[in-house]
Amino acid sequence: MRVLLQRVSQASVSIDDTVHGQIGSGFLLLVGAQDQDTSEQIDYLVHKISHLRVFEDDAGKMNLSINDVGGQILSVSQFTLYANTKKGNRPSFVGAGDPQHASQIYDEFNQKLAATGLTVATGVFGADMQVALVNDGPVTIWFDTDA
C-alpha cells in the first residue's frame, strides 16, 4: 500500500465541477493499493498517519500530531502511485490492485482513520477527480508498506 501525505492548510476534491469533499488544515492523502495489501498494513498506516508529528508546537518545532492540532484528512484514491516508468514513455499500472480489492482496501483505510476520531473527507474511488490544495510547509511524506 502506498500513501503520499501532504500537509495542507486547505484541500478539496471535485467531481464534475461539484465539490465532493473538502477540509481545512490537515493532511491530503493520495492512496494506492495492491492486490496483496492487508488489514495489518492498513492498521500500520493509520497508526503512523494519525500519530505523525509534523505540525509545529509553540517553539516552532514539528512536534504535534494531526490529532493534537484538530486537523482533518482528505483521502483520495490514486492508482497511479503504482506507475512503472522503467520501460518506454507510457507508464504501466499493472502493479496497481484489482479495482474491486483496491476499493475495499481504500474504504477500510478511510473507516479506520475515522475511527481514530479524525474527520475524514474522501473522493470517490475510480472517479475522474480534480484535487485542489494549498501545501503547508511544504511537508510531503511518502509511505510504502513494501519498502
From Swiss-Prot:
A GO molecular-function descriptor: Ser(Gly)-tRNA(Ala) hydrolase activity
Catalysed reactions, semicolon-separated: glycyl-tRNA(Ala) + H2O = tRNA(Ala) + glycine + H(+); a D-aminoacyl-tRNA + H2O = a tRNA + a D-alpha-amino acid + H(+)
GO biological process: D-amino acid catabolic process
Enzyme Commission designation: 3.1.1.96
Signal peptide: none
Coiled coil (residue ranges): none
Keywords on record: Cytoplasm, Hydrolase, RNA-binding, tRNA-binding
Primary location group: cytoplasm
One Gene Ontology cellular component: cytoplasm
tRNA-binding recorded as keyword: yes
Motif Gly-cisPro motif, important for rejection of L-amino acids mapped to chain: 137-138
Subcellular location: Cytoplasm
Domain of life, per lineage: Bacteria
Family, as annotated: Belongs to the DTD family.
Domain notes: A Gly-cisPro motif from one monomer fits into the active site of the other monomer to allow specific chiral rejection of L-amino acids.
Self-association and partners: Homodimer.
HAMAP family for the chain: Deacylase_Dtd (MF_00518)
Name of the protein described by the UniProt record: D-aminoacyl-tRNA deacylase
Source organism (scientific name): Levilactobacillus brevis (strain ATCC 367 / BCRC 12310 / CIP 105137 / JCM 1170 / LMG 11437 / NCIMB 947 / NCTC 947) (Lactobacillus brevis)
Lineage: Bacteria, Bacillati, Bacillota, Bacilli, Lactobacillales
